[in-house]
Regions:
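A glycine-rich, acidic short-motif signal
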Residues: 1-236
Length: 236
């Protein structure tokens, strides 16, 4: 008996329209086989070092329950090598747009991802090792009107880096927090401009405030605030 289950478990990526030469490079393997490259990207996502891979079934469920879905996107370089390109926002009518750059980084953080190396000023770099999120819904008149997010980042200086003084360490924490907060803000603004609740906030906030009604259609009008707190420790 035919079963669609294996197909529903396959990971899905989005790739923008590109020229024939680049498509041919991918078909011939490029610098490395497409299958191997996709496997590497999926593994990085599972380890929190990139966009979390999405299965076909998960994507379809998000479209049914949220009216939208955020799917990891890829781009091709001149040789046909597949590179991460943020994510695409799908709605029932098709592609609503892309999250790239800061917005893509913000989306990773909003999904509890985003671990890995972050370059900071002064030639410093930190490795984000943990991302924790806490949403607090806001309601008025029995209806959810917004939410506040507190995102806590734990990071450490890269191994071999000179130990900083306390004042410099605190400065790195402020810089990491401010930069990450800007990325989260960019992602939230992009999603709200499309009224695309790819974070399932409607259902999550309804569970946190069961006496208040959370309308998915009003997601774009909610007041969403974000605060990032970072803790940076000295590398061993």
């Amino acid at each position: 008996r035919y079963s669609a289950l294996p197909r529903m478990l396959l990971s899905v990526w989005m790739l923008p329209r590109t020229d024939a030469a680049k498509r041919a490079a991918v078909s011939s393997g490029g610098q490395e086989g497409a299958a191997l490259r996709l496997s590497t990207l999926a593994e990085d996502g599972q380890l929190g070092r990139g966009a979390l891979p999405r299965a076909v079934g998960e994507t379809m469920t998000d479209l049914l329950e949220n009216g939208c879905a955020c799917v990891p996107a890829l781009a091709l370089d001149e040789s046909g090598l597949l590179l991460e390109r943020g994510c695409g926002v799908l709605v029932h009518g098709g592609l609503a747009g892309w999250l790239e750059g800061d917005a893509a980084r913000g989306m990773e953080l909003l999904e509890g991802q985003g671990t890995g190396t972050v370059e900071l000023s002064g030639g410093r770099a930190v490795e984000v090792t943990e991302v924790r999120l806490r949403w607090t819904p806001e309601a008025d008149g029995g209806r959810v009107t917004g939410a506040g997010l507190v995102c806590r980042l734990t990071a450490r200086l890269e191994e071999g880096a000179a130990a900083p003084e306390k004042e410099e360490l605190e400065g790195l924490e402020r810089e990491l927090a401010a930069r990450s907060e800007g990325c989260i803000r960019a992602a939230l603004d992009s999603l709200q401009s499309r009224n695309a609740d790819c974070l399932s906030l409607t259902r999550r906030l309804a569970a946190l405030r069961p006496m208040a009604r959370a309308d998915r259609e009003r997601f774009g009008t909610w007041e969403l605030t974000a605060e990032v707190r970072a803790e940076v420790t000295r590398g061993e």
